[in-house]
């Protein structure tokens, strides 16, 4: 696999010599001071001298004080050159290495011993409740020396300060506040979790996976990093729930939501079955509507803790576009309107839109709102069946309805999107017409980030398991080539690894909250590795093992464009995005078919009306798509893969999705997901403080042009991270480095449309509203309408308005040219550390 990071440290920073003994304090001290000297100034820089005299010596003497010195001494220099962020990361990496066990095996035993002591049991060689998983400990007992030999500690030095701090604070295992893992130990633990350790090729598979993850070519979702290889081992990212219109179901969903949030999952819930305000209950009762339920789940999200250093609980509730409580729901987060009792503060909301609603918006027609208990079954329909039933309900005088202007409602929705960033928009017809889960039923909601579309009902909790390919590290900058086969191979490794995670996940089988109600149990059984997962036992295991869903996507797409000098809003970018996504889909499908050849397809593959059994993949749902014409056969051996797919089936019902990748992109120093960079100068929070980052690609290009100086740093700051008004920068450079608010808002829609044929699920698509736009609400409406016309499944995740505070209000920097040094390719000896 030719990922540029898989076998080396970061290009342009590959100044770490081979053979450095990282366990020798004297050698590492010498190395760090040499790295500090890898910057030169026309005048000797007192800040860098202070870095020598204080930071490195503090590292050798006192870890805690060194952390504070690092923040004070290095981070203020980062705006002058991105390499300071890597220097800070390298110093932090060394501090971590001298304060964690010397080998991976020692770390495993240390964790087990510490957890065992907490539980009153001392034996590092045996499994301990709350520690690492039994299979990890057993495998380390047998193969510890081989695993230790795989660890490449130099790779810890390829992370910038933001990335390594995120890993250490949010992912690495601590017991009683003592840190046991450095980044490489995290990656090895995750690689082992993603491997079938009973396989004859286990060590080879661990090595392959470890190389990709530690090389920043493959990034696993947060729950995998948190829990992979531990006894808790919930590695799923997303859970989708469907709530019924009765107190038993509502109570059950509250309990299930609390349970799943505690497992580090993000939650998406369908609220559309709940009857509207004033609807009849029993003989004389009346419903309070969805408002109180929103507030209930809002409090759940605020009250459940996912554990130290992990992300807070988060829930998204979805509502259909014809629900009679539409306006109560719409204003539930707007402080100036609605009933305060029904307010939500952290609960996110999504709207499920039909083609019929969009048609009536376009034609300026009326739209009818109903209570679900008056139109039972309507939410299960889509397409022409929905249109016929909806019109019949409108024509029925016995059914109560509220009539509104479709265009006015759409405008009010867009106003809320501008004001609050929500609701998300999910296009129901596009989702279901191109669903791999048609054989299961109608999809009625998405997940927390609006990229997962899987079937769920009151007796089945949909699950998804995520990864992203760091596509920017498959670019050869010197030749301008992209290693598409390497991307496909990485997607295959992700697919194989996620399948192992699905099999090994701790499904909490005895948890009453995750069981079917007694009168709704069946005798269906799924068997994996000799363990029978009964439908009557657990709703999560049933869904995950029956359908084996995955969501493999990408991060760093804009990094690819910037490396290759391609504007984000160009036709070249749209075509390149499609090729990259095709590579990911090809690699994932190829591996899933290979697994099916060995182990068989996913169990629900054999159910009636399964589109995979009909020989269809996602691109086959698109009208006019021709496999011979539209697949890139010169790059990918699609014909061979499709032949095997038709013969053996596929091991996963869905393999691709496009998640937002916010935290993992930070760890890997990439622009998030498929998005354009938000600014060329931005602030990042680390620990208790913040520091400013300059776009590293822009800085390099300006440095190559001889334009990187103190004046340029100041100009970028004065323009709030934009370079469009800095006329001394060549126009072609300004085109390449337009930010998310400066590119044509249609560009991200076109990127999504380009990659959608190769995404089984959907795309977490944001909109960044341009500055100084005359009518932002109108622009939001146009963006959603364009997404609908281009057949996207997700019309919108977040709508990003203009931040209230300009970024230059924080940490205004004053640099002189002497502060703006250039990296020196060779290391410079320093007499101060030669002793």
From Swiss-Prot:
Its EC number is 1.17.4.1. Substrate binds at residues 222, 237-238, 266, 447-451, 660-664. It catalyses: a 2'-deoxyribonucleoside 5'-diphosphate + [thioredoxin]-disulfide + H2O = a ribonucleoside 5'-diphosphate + [thioredoxin]-dithiol. The active site is at 447 (proton acceptor), 449 (cysteine radical intermediate), 451 (proton acceptor). Keywords: Deoxyribonucleotide synthesis, Disulfide bond, Oxidoreductase. The keyword Disulfide bond applies. It is an enzyme of class 1 (oxidoreductase). Ribonucleoside-diphosphate reductase holoenzyme provides the precursors necessary for viral DNA synthesis. Allows virus growth in non-dividing cells. Catalyzes the biosynthesis of deoxyribonucleotides from the corresponding ribonucleotides. Belongs to the ribonucleoside diphosphate reductase large chain family. This is Ribonucleoside-diphosphate reductase large subunit. It comes from Ostreid herpesvirus 1 (isolate France) (OsHV-1).
